[in-house]
């Protein structure tokens, strides 16, 4: 056994089906750093698979039964279904097939762990937690759901006793993670294809917190009504709350924005202390809220107030979370993963804060809906979440393998936005149409915010060069 896991060191080659996925690759990287033999397949090469290859992994392009010739263990995500050539081969050969969350849980066994849960904000919060803990000298191991700019990876191998992980609620497997400290950022209706209804999702988060050991800690955002209700259900675990409201144990006050930078003070109400003059180099009330959770945990672990203030000011961000990909002729291009109405509203509010109330800068939102089922289930919310955008452009739905649903198309959403009173909503066909829109509609001082979990990220990243061409 290695010092960091109960996994036998001679378990044999561990094969990841879909190793380039953001959730799978971080686990693979940690295993490589621990000395395990790692291999995996993905449909195409990417920066992530190339990085893993440099670290020593064997990478197969395409998924075929013969890729498992040397494998002894096979790791899959919930996206891998029967009929996948590699999964079928693993079961035919009687190889152990391990869910992603089970393998992550194995890595967590002999560490003290901080699991970041919530419908939105997990990746950014995990990144903030990691960066504050590094600055505080805790040297954590990290497995995140996004690329952390400070590391150029979604994983970090540390020598300290703490591990920070993003806890994904989408398939319920976050309740298998042996957390010591659990963070809950918010709870909104999402991933109903797994949970079935909102009550079951609520119960899932209750179980997430209830699984903590008696010496554990729940860190909860009580600005969110559902999380506040969850806190009311917790009767036998310690709880620390955070937020902007007057009852929060860790509270942000005096929040202002200047040049896209948040300025605020933090009240540590249980301690009777204050951290004055904090800055966070990214806009958005939701980002300040996420930072408070990291402050709450790091303060609980003994980090000094001055260390916290310095670390917040140096925060480097995370890929696809309000990421500036370029500026052309005074027009800023932003790429963001937001694909749920709550996320979209928060990002557009942040964009409005970033350009400021002075001047004539406008926010142009470009959204590619992700999954017909999400658009259908939350249609009215989608129609009302773009209010901070001056112009809204909607691309074709990124199906993610789903069949179309009547009433949940690109054109349905555009019509719905107009019915809900949006003055400037339109459909776009493709990347070329986006280029025309930006050239025709923008002026210096504007911000173009590309939102979605599908191919729109590539559109956003290619846009600055195409505008210059």
Curated annotation (Swiss-Prot):
One of its GO terms (molecular function) is ATP binding. GO terms for cellular component: cytoplasm. It is found in: Cytoplasm. Disulfide bonds: none annotated. SUPFAM superfamilies: MurCD N-terminal domain (SSF51984), MurD-like peptide ligases, catalytic domain (SSF53623), MurD-like peptide ligases, peptide-binding domain (SSF53244). Keywords: ATP-binding, Cell cycle, Cell division, Cell shape, Cell wall biogenesis/degradation, Cytoplasm, Ligase, Nucleotide-binding, Peptidoglycan synthesis. InterPro entries: Mur-like_cat_sf (IPR036565), Mur_ligase_C (IPR004101), Mur_ligase_C_dom_sf (IPR036615), Mur_ligase_cen (IPR013221), Mur_ligase_N (IPR000713), MurCDEF_pg_biosynth (IPR050061), UDP-N-AcMur_Ala_ligase_MurC (IPR005758). GO terms for biological process: cell division; cell wall organization; peptidoglycan biosynthetic process; regulation of cell shape. The lineage of its organism: Bacteria, Pseudomonadati, Pseudomonadota, Alphaproteobacteria, Rhodobacterales. Gene3D superfamilies: Mur ligase, C-terminal domain (3.90.190.20), Mur-like, catalytic domain (3.40.1190.10), NAD(P)-binding Rossmann-like Domain (3.40.50.720). Its EC number is 6.3.2.8. This is UDP-N-acetylmuramate--L-alanine ligase. NCBIfam families: murC. It comes from Ruegeria sp. (strain TM1040) (Silicibacter sp.). ATP binds at residues 118-124. Pathway: Cell wall biogenesis; peptidoglycan biosynthesis. Cell wall formation.
């Amino acid at each position: 056994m290695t010092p960091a896991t109960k996994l036998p060191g001679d378990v044999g080659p561990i094969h990841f089906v879909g190793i380039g996925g953001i959730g799978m690759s971080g686990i693979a990287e940690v295993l490589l750093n621990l000395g395990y033999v790692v291999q995996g397949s993905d449909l195409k090469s990417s920066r992530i698979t190339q990085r893993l290859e440099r670290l020593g992994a064997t990478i197969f392009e395409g998924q075929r039964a013969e890729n498992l010739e040397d494998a002894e263990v096979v790791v899959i995500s919930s996206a891998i279904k029967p009929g996948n050539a590699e999964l079928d081969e693993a079961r035919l050969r009687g190889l152990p097939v391990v869910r992603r969350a089970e393998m992550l849980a194995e890595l967590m066994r002999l560490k003290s762990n901080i699991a970041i849960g919530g419908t939105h904000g997990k990746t950014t919060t995990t990144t903030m937690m990691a960066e504050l803990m590094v600055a505080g000298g805790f040297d954590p191991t990290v497995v995140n759901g996004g690329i952390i700019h400070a590391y150029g990876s979604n994983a970090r191998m540390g020598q300290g006793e703490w591990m920070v992980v993003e806890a994904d609620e989408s398939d319920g497997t976050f309740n298998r993670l042996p957390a010591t400290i659990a963070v809950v950022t918010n709870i909104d209706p999402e991933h109903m294809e797994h949970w079935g209804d909102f009550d079951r999702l609520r119960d899932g988060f209750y179980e997430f917190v209830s699984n903590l050991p008696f010496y554990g800690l729940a860190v909860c955002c009580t600005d969110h009504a559902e999380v506040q209700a969850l806190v009311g259900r917790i009767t036998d675990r310690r709880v620390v709350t955070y937020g902007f409201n007057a009852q929060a144990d860790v509270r942000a006050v005096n929040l202002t924005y200047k040049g896209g930078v948040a300025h605020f003070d933090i009240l540590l109400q249980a301690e009777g202390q204050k951290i004055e003059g904090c800055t966070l180099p990214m806009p958005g009330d939701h980002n300040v809220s996420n930072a408070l959770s990291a402050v709450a945990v790091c303060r609980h672990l003994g980090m000094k107030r001055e260390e916290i203030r310095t670390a917040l000011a140096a925060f480097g961000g995370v890929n696809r979370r309000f990421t500036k990909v370029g500026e052309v002729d005074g027009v800023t291009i932003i790429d963001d993963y937001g694909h749920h109405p709550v996320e979209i509203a928060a990002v557009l509010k942040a964009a409005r804060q970033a350009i400021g109330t002075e001047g004539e800068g406008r926010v142009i939102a470009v959204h590619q809906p992700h999954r017909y089922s999400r658009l259908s289930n939350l249609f009215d919310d989608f129609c009302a979440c773009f209010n901070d955008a001056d112009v809204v452009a909607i691309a074709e739905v990124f199906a993610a393998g789903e069949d179309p649903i009547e009433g949940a198309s690109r054109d349905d959403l555009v019509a719905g936005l107009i019915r809900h009173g949006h003055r400037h909503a339109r459909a776009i066909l493709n990347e070329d149409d986006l280029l025309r829109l930006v050239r025709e509609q923008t002026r210096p001082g504007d911000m173009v915010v590309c939102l979605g979990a599908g191919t729109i990220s590539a559109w956003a990243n290619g846009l600055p060069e195409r505008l210059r061409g």
